[in-house]
């Protein structure tokens, strides 16, 4: 809101004097009841017992009529007319004409304003002198049926007052096929909306004005389709070079400049074809957040809300009952939020989107297009801004929706404009989650040190320490925005941005966010050479079993692998149940040839199958099974889930793939239940995995009969941790047996951990938690051919714990896939 040292208009009252004479045919004192006078619309005015009858009509050239509001609708909603400051209720004659009988004026001047039902909030004491033009408007024409209209008496029109608009209307015809969420027009230094004094010269500004108008087009979640006319009411003025920002339901944005010159009662129509800004994948400038104070403008700034009452974070005064569709017509101070905390109960919000869990009303959340946000915890709107942790010493969180517009693996730039609150005493943690690694970061154009960037599990993190931020001494003085830029590689359609103060203890964690923008910088990588895909698909892809594996098949096709290895490749349970299915109902593993053909693989083979968790390999190239492993040379000590050597013939090149799935428990194999705790304490699960791995290595990559074979891959669910990740785990001194299984490979083979070596210094979890237990190893000859390698995180593979069927399983799996391209 722009500031001026003037009185607030809505609190102002004018004392207007009335007289009993006027120009025209003077007939005072005749004793005729004004209601019985014999007069018709359009005649010269006449005075009967000190009153003048005026008929009320709508000017056919009124701006809102040109905008499509029917004059008959306006007249039917007419409630009262103010003439020279005095209110008169509207009456109707026998012909249905609306009229009032107003006190005659000695000077013969009559300034009138027409008020509509429920319209008093638009002008306070009198529409003749006050007018509120909201900065937040709606795509429906509701406001155009409520904002007062005005007329001045003239001899030319006689006793008819033709009501016009004091505002101008900009009508934008937005072409295209998008669904529009908001249209914002802004001109720095202007008074486009706010509270005004109505004078003969026009609308005079108060100390509560705005340099923008935002048209809310959310329409109850249906939005407004392009191809429509979008009308906004503006204070008359020249707004050449104004910025026009159009946002869609899926957070695409178009920004352009527009020359606008609207006159009082003027109607200016312009055509705009919606074309999203090049390469912008996702944007939120919080244009739909229009309520509350201008927190960045300082104490001399103001704002507007549906009520002038203070808003608290929680409780009865939190504004939680606000619907989001109310008109903001009351002035509020710069530091007053426009709503309560959008989310305030972590137990309710955790793991859900804002659309699923919120403390504000459903209508409010929809009206701000916030339903897709991952978190807006302890967040609330100010004017054009989202405030986090305001008015509380507890930490708040903002987390965007997933950037679903990303297709494949992309390099992106994420830009955040933010400002810490006065007295901020935390550090800010920005995390790119579920896809993508931060390659570089800058703050206000200055590069941040690499040691402030890390990757852990599924989260790429950047920390901003206090000494790098400008912490305001007080928000009562105007503030500037910081700009953080994050360059990210391998972002996917599941990627989202999470940020908050890092500490969870009591403190000043508050910050404000102006905008978030994600820009596409191009593909991270394309398929190159032989593409190998591995995944533990949890119980034979239990999650997609009732759907005949259609989603799974489409997902595989999207990556176009040449070879697939699936762990837990057998059906076990009935649909969405933990009840074991009869053997006759178990589609897998026998059904793999049929499934594989649906995603383009002609060949398939099953590994050592001794229980419910075998491995299956499928391929575009011929497969020869060289060895199946189930038992070992020690009785009662099998390779628990089997293993195999599957040989591919890739255009004449023979590649051996060892598939395996190691013992999963902390206790040893075959240990009776009563002894399992003791077995765990003795780390017998780790020792059994070590035993299995020694047997597999001795009979595959180190077996004399395969000494001439040079091209090897080994992959599967190893259920064990690697010394490559010791920098993160730090188990060497406290839990050294965790590394026994992987140490067999490290100490006895030349196999290379592809993911571990491709991303040094990064801890890349292969599960939904913080564990890297799935690996793809390569011989030196194969590792030298690695072109691309990634642990896939996308919208399909993000592990989500089953909350519907109480199975304890995940959708689609509790593991993440690994994808590697080899340039052979």
Question: What do the PLM-derived regions correspond to, one by one?
Answer:
Residues 133-149, 325-406:
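Surface-exposed, low-complexity/disordered Ser/Thr/Gly/Pro/Asn-rich loops and linkers
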Residues 2-8, 22-280, 292, 298-300, ...:
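Sec-type signal peptide cleavage vicinity
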Residues 393-395, 502-519:
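Extracellular carbohydrate recognition
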Residues 522-598, 610-612, 814:
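N-terminal, active-site-proximal structural segment of metallo-dependent hydrolase catalytic domains
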Residues 569-667:
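Structured beta-strand-rich core segments of catalytic domains in phosphoester-bond hydrolases
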Residues 440-491:
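Extracellular carbohydrate recognition and processing domains
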Residues 277-360:
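Extracellular carbohydrate-recognition regions
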Residues 523-524, 702-713, 720-824:
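Metal-dependent phosphoester-hydrolase catalytic domains
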């Amino acid at each position: 809101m722009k500031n001026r040292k003037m009185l607030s208009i809505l609190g102002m009252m004018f004392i207007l004097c009335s007289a009993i004479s006027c120009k025209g045919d003077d007939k005072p004192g005749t004793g005729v009841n004004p209601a019985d006078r014999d007069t018709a619309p359009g005649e010269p005015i006449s005075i009967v017992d000190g009153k003048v009858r005026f008929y009320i009509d709508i000017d056919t050239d009124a701006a809102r009529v040109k905008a499509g509001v029917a004059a008959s609708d306006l007249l039917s909603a007419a409630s009262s007319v103010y003439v020279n400051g005095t209110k008169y209720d509207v009456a109707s004659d026998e012909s249905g004409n609306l009229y009032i009988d107003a006190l005659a004026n000695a000077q013969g001047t009559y300034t009138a304003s027409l008020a509509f039902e429920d319209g008093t909030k638009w002008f306070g004491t009198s529409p003749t002198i006050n007018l509120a033009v909201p900065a937040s408007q709606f795509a429906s024409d509701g406001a155009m049926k409520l904002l007062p209209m005005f007329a001045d008496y003239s001899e030319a029109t006689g006793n008819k007052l033709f009501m016009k608009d004091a505002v101008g209307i900009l009508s934008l015809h937005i072409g295209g096929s998008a669904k529009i969420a908001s249209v914002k027009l802004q001109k720095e230094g202007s008074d486009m909306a706010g509270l005004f004094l109505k004078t003969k010269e026009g609308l005079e500004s108060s100390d509560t004005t705005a340099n923008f108008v935002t048209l809310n087009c959310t329409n109850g979640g249906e939005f407004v389709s392009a191809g429509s006319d979008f009308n906004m009411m503006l204070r008359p003025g020249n707004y050449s070079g104004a910025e026009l920002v159009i946002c869609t339901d899926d957070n695409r944005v178009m920004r352009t400049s527009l020359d606008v010159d609207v006159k009082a009662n003027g109607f200016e129509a312009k055509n705009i074809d919606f074309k999203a800004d090049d390469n912008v994948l996702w944007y939120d400038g919080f244009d739909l957040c229009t309520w509350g104070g201008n927190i960045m403008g300082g104490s001399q700034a103001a704002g507007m809300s549906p009520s002038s009452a203070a808003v608290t974070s929680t409780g009865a005064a939190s504004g939680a009952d606000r619907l989001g569709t109310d008109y903001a017509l009351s002035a509020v101070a710069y530091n007053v939020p426009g709503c309560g905390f959008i989310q305030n109960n972590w137990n309710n919000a955790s793991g859900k989107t804002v659309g699923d869990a919120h403390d504000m009303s459903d209508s409010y959340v929809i009206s701000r297009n916030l339903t897709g946000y991952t978190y807006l915890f302890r967040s609330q709107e100010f004017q054009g801004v989202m405030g986090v942790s305001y008015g509380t010493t507890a930490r708040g969180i903002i987390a965007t929706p997933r950037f679903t517009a990303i297709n494949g693996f992309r390099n992106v730039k994420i830009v955040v404009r933010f400002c810490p609150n006065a007295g901020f005493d935390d550090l800010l943690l920005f995390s790119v989650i579920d896809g993508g690694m931060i390659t570089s970061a800058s703050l206000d154009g200055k590069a941040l040190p690499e040691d402030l960037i890390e990757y852990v599990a599924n989260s790429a993190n950047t920390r901003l320490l206090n000494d790098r931020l400008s912490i305001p001494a007080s928000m009562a003085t105007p503030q500037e925005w910081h700009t953080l830029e994050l360059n990210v590689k391998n972002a996917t359609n599941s990627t989202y941005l999470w940020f908050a103060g890092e500490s969870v203890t009591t403190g000043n964690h508050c910050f404000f966010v102006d905008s978030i923008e994600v820009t596409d910088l191009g593909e991270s990588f394309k398929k190159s050479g032989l593409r190998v895909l591995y995944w533990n698909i949890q119980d034979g892809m239990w999650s997609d079993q009732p759907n005949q594996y259609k989603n799974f098949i489409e997902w595989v096709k999207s990556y176009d692998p040449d070879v697939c290895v699936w762990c837990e490749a057998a059906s076990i349970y009935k649909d969405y149940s933990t009840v074991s299915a009869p053997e006759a109902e178990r589609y897998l593993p026998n059904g793999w040839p049929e499934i594989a053909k649906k995603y383009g693989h002609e060949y398939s083979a099953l590994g050592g199958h001794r229980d419910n968790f075998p491995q299956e390999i499928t391929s575009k190239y011929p497969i020869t099974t060289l060895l199946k492993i189930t038992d070992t040379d020690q009785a009662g000590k099998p390779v628990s889930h089997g293993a195999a050597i599957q040989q591919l013939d890739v255009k004449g090149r023979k590649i051996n793939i060892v598939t395996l799935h190691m013992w999963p428990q902390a206790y040893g194999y075959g240990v009776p239940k009563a002894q399992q705790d003791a077995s765990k304490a003795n780390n017998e699960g780790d020792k059994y995995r070590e035993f299995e791995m020694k047997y597999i290595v001795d009979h595959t990559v180190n077996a004399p009969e395969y000494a001439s074979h040079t091209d090897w891959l080994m992959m599967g669910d190893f259920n064990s941790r690697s010394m490559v990740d010791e920098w993160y785990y730090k188990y060497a001194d406290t839990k050294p047996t965790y590394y026994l299984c992987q140490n067999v490979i490290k100490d006895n083979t030349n196999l290379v951990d592809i993911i571990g070596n491709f991303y040094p210094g990064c801890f890349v979890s292969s599960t939904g938690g913080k564990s890297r237990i799935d690996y793809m190893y390569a011989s030196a000859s194969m590792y030298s051919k690695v072109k691309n390698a990634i642990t896939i995180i996308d919208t399909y593979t993000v592990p989500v714990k089953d909350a519907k069927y109480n199975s304890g399983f995940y959708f689609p799996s509790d593991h993440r896939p690994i994808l590697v391209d080899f340039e052979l």
